[in-house]
Amino acid sequence: NIIVQPVIFEKIDSDAISKSAQNIHGSGGPTRIDADTWKNMICSKAHGSEGLQLGDEIASLSKRLCSEEIPYEHISSLMSCRLVPLKKLDNSVRPVGIGETLRRIISKAVVSMLKQDILCASGCLQTCAGLEGGIEAAVHSMREIFENNQCEAVILIDAENAFNRLNRQVALKNIKQICPNLHQFLSNSYSNPANRGCSKFCEVSRIPINHI
């Protein structure tokens, strides 16, 4: 087994959390605490030292999520999401899960710190993993292929959401090998079913759903 040294996560500090909070947008999860509210609590100078202390505490939680196996009952509220029903063209309903803003802040800070690890793990197969100009390069490459008179091709558009079809346990097992520094954080986040709240009922998600 690959041993991950917790010291690598020391870069996640109050400043990293503040930068992450400044780049978060959108509504809140079950607590309804949206991005603007968290941004104000963490980044506003009006709160003085309390904002810095909050950033430090969130950073400490982030580092624990990256380096320790935390009992799920201790973080189940953080991993919960609020379901919003979206009406589709065929009049059916598609549930979209809105996760807690705090979880998104932590995730962004962790991903930012492990950017190079994620880039190495995903390679050229995933242009959305942080590779600069990756999507633009892919578009230009396809254009060159189509404009080549010697080329005959058909492009098949993958319109399905791969995250919805993902087997969590298999994915976590693979991540442990190809990106070990990220494994514990993802394991704490996705090993257990997430509570999904919608109106007056709550159900448990055993398969992935869309997260905002």
PLM feature spans:
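Conserved pre-catalytic core of RNA-dependent polymerases
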Residues: 3-212
